Amino acid sequence: MVHGNSRPLEKDVVRDLRRELSYGQYLRLDRLLDAQHPVSEPEHHDELLFIIQHQTVELWLKLILHELRTAREHLARDELKPALKQLARVKHVQHTLTEQWSVLATLTPAEYVEFRGFLGRSSGFQSYQYRAIELILGNKNAEMLEVFAHDEFAHELLNGLLKEPSVYDEFVRLLHRRGHDVPAAFLQRDVSLPHTFTPELVPLFRGIYETAAENWDAYEACEELVDLEENFQFWRFRHLKTVERTIGLKHGTGGSSGVSFLRRALELTFFPELYAVRTEI
């Protein structure tokens, strides 16, 4: 019998899943939902929020890294249009990550201080996936690998990305193969070092912007990369402000100076020439 304010189950809905792959099995929900283990004693109500916030961030970072590596592979094979698809997806994930800070911002200083001491030296600064994304976007910093010496898998991943070309490196190399004038010094540079502003690249991008109709996919890629960097900065800023409203000017659990350290990250750039060209157009 169907009562009011209810929806009857359709006859073809699968009811017996004993021999079928179920939703929970496919997503490994038994493991996923058993991965939240508060360390506070007695267990603090808000620690679950804190854990889930960071775990979901790590899941999204995993997807971003997956998409950026694929985009880089496409660029290396001169497949610009498929790479644009990956970059577009990354941008949407970035929007989700930035907005997600509003959930953690519901944690007040008075609530957080009640379990912060149980976190020891663990810190979001130690997120190897976040560092991996910075590396693949060109923010190379070999010193950062020291933080992951205890984790063989993470250290190997980051060391590999440190020595590999960034997404930006591969994009500029693609432009070179298409006949655009790229400085030899850029093509031959040590990709394990951070990319710094190269004024000789600006005329290249100016030419693309001023002949957009003839270079539409390259023009679109330039704008996608600017969007990506801008979104990254939005995320960094929301991170900074969430930390500031939660712990003020206290030092981070990982030993950093906290807010002032995060503020300096706002000065880091991935694609400085794509911003500089705007002054020249």
Curated annotation (Swiss-Prot):
Q: Where does heme bind?
A: 239
Task: Give me the comment on cofactor binding.
Answer: Binds 1 heme group per subunit.
Pfam families linked to this entry: Trp_dioxygenase
The pathway to which it is assigned is: Amino-acid degradation; L-tryptophan degradation via kynurenine pathway; L-kynurenine from L-tryptophan: step 1/2
- Where do the annotations place substrate binding? 50-54, 112, 116, 253
Name of the protein described by the UniProt record: Tryptophan 2,3-dioxygenase
What keywords does the record list, in alphabetical order? Dioxygenase, Heme, Iron, Metal-binding, Oxidoreductase, Tryptophan catabolism
- Please provide the Gene Ontology terms (biological process) for this protein: L-tryptophan catabolic process to acetyl-CoA; L-tryptophan catabolic process to kynurenine
Catalytic activity reported? L-tryptophan + O2 = N-formyl-L-kynurenine
Q: Which family does it belong to?
A: Belongs to the tryptophan 2,3-dioxygenase family.
General function of this protein = Heme-dependent dioxygenase that catalyzes the oxidative cleavage of the L-tryptophan (L-Trp) pyrrole ring and converts L-tryptophan to N-formyl-L-kynurenine. Catalyzes the oxidative cleavage of the indole moiety.
Q: How does it assemble?
A: Homotetramer.
Cofactor(s) for this UniProt protein: heme
Query: Can you name the source organism?
Result: Saccharopolyspora erythraea (strain ATCC 11635 / DSM 40517 / JCM 4748 / NBRC 13426 / NCIMB 8594 / NRRL 2338)
| Signal sequence bounds | none
What are the EC numbers?
1.13.11.11
**HAMAP family, per database record:** T23O
- Alphabetical list of InterPro entries matching this protein: Trp/Indoleamine_2_3_dOase-like (IPR037217), Trp_2_3_dOase (IPR004981)
A single Gene Ontology MF term assigned here is: heme binding
